[in-house]
Amino acid sequence: MAAMDPRNNGNVAPLNERERAENLEVREVVEVQDDQSVVSLMSNDSDLQKKMMKKEEKKNGGWTNAIILLVNQGLATLAFFGVGVNLVLFLTRVMGQGNAEAANNVSKWTGTVYMFSLVGAFLSDSYWGRYLTCTIFQVIFVIGVGLLSFVSWFFLIKPRGCGDGDLECNPPSSLGVAIFYLSVYLVAFGYGGHQPTLATFGADQLDDDKNSKAAFFSYFYFALNVGALFSNTILVYFEDKGLWTEGFLVSLGSAIVALVAFLAPTRQYRYVKPCGNPLPRVAQVFVATARKWSVVRPGDPHELYELEGPESAIKGSRKIFHSTKFLFLDRAAVITENDRNGTRSNAWRLCSVTQVEEAKCVMKLLPIWLCTIIYSVIFTQMASLFVEQGDVMNAYVGKFHIPAASMSVFDIFSVFVSTGIYRHIIFPYVRPTELMRMGIGLIIGIMAMVAAGLTEIQRLKRVVPGQKESELTILWQIPQYVLVGASEVFMYVGQLEFFNGQAPDGLKNLGSSLCMASMALGNYVSSLMVNIVMAITKRGENSPGWIPENLNEGHMDRFYFLIAALAAIDFVVYLIFAKWYQPISHDEDSIKGGSGGSLKKTVSELEQV
């Protein structure tokens, strides 16, 4: 690759081969204390420099810290689902909202949770770093759960024990409603803001071994479901009995313990410095491309500009090899006569190949990411329409009453079983790629929607006139929950690995947040679909719509089948983009920029002699 001398005021003035050979004969011996030995290093020995840096990075970290972060994830998830899993029933029973309104509000809230992940990822990658980002947002999360416990106790649960499905609550005051929404959106901000960063921070604790990091992401999702298991059984049961405040207080305690566990090993964590704001870097590529639109791209990518030596031009990032996608962006790395004539280089006119490839990576990931949104529409039904569907079914098994929200325990058990089957039976022999696993997850998700639609058809057939609940047992919902759980193992764990592994070093948190951003848009799309479907299908009293206040008068089965049909179309589009996708290729012999300046500086100075 063509090189620009970083010590020559940004001028493009490459040395000829003879001068370079003469300069490189000069050696500077650097004495480095390593335990009890003294090692002499040559200033141009990039391999040894890289090993020194990696050894320095690996002093801390390890699986012990990673396990602590998994515990933190489980406890934080317990607290989060203690709020979220029964939120739709809290809105209908305590806040007095209708089914469609409550389902929409839950979808919007859940979408906001995951949309805030982009905020956390940006702050982490650009300014705060992973540790500080996780700390700040977990503190916000604790404040939100605490405020929710307070407003429930003093404003909303009136009289005591109301909201159990039998005893109605008094209409909430305006102040109570305001504090309630403030608290739940603080919960959304705090939990969503730190989730993707926590996943990346956990991966940072491990060495650069793909299998170790793949195992961590599987355990990360496993820990999430362990925390959700307690919330979806014990907490849901008490909240279903009207003990809402007590359930929120348990969530508060879990959130506090999670924060303490996270802070405990602060000195033992392995830290990765933020790489700076990526937005200007990406924008520079497009601006430079536009300014050089008439420039002819060279046939040989080695003629494009790249920083010479092992160090990357982007702080905290390895070099990225040239790719054959979006070749028009290569113009940003073409060295023109204006760049060679001695004028000062302009970052908005000339970009390195690594910087161009960083922008290409973002563009290559977007089509894959967009195809995951419909799956998130499938997933979000579990927290809204699945619960409302179960609430109008026969929830008794003998004399034992099963809360509708507790049916998600079958989703969790399905995740446990599917994770074990995948890690110990499928993976050792087949080892499907992340893209293959995501496609499998989408297919299973379609099957879940079909199962939910068939269950709804049977539920409507067993409705007794004048009764709210159908005679169909709630156990008919088991297949749809099990299928959603199995699909998660393939889709969401695959997404975590794919977006984290394919994101450039300077955008790792953004890569992890794309998974949660997909969930966010999935919830918003679900809410939009409900509104559109109700607007089209509601025709007065004789046609109350597919999802009316009284579900026995609607056709929620058709809504499930609509989602399945859209997901099938999405799967075809996904196959096209998955086949088109070209993986990122890092230069493993390169050094993360901004971290090895001393030795590099010596070589640069010698080259100017």
Curated annotation (Swiss-Prot):
Keywords: Membrane, Phosphoprotein, Transmembrane, Transmembrane helix, Transport. GO terms for cellular component: plasma membrane. Expressed in flowers. InterPro entries: MFS_trans_sf (IPR036259), POT_fam (IPR000109). Pfam families: PTR2. It comes from the Eukaryota. SUPFAM superfamilies: MFS general substrate transporter. It is a multi-pass membrane protein. The chain crosses the membrane at residues 67-87, 109-129, 136-156, 173-193, 216-236, 243-263, 367-387, 402-422, 438-458, 474-494, 516-536, 559-579. The modification Phosphothreonine is found at T133. GO terms for molecular function: transmembrane transporter activity. It is found in: Membrane. Disulfide bonds: none annotated. Belongs to the major facilitator superfamily. Proton-dependent oligopeptide transporter (POT/PTR) (TC 2.A.17) family. PANTHER family: OLIGOPEPTIDE TRANSPORTER-RELATED. This is Protein NRT1/ PTR FAMILY 7.1.
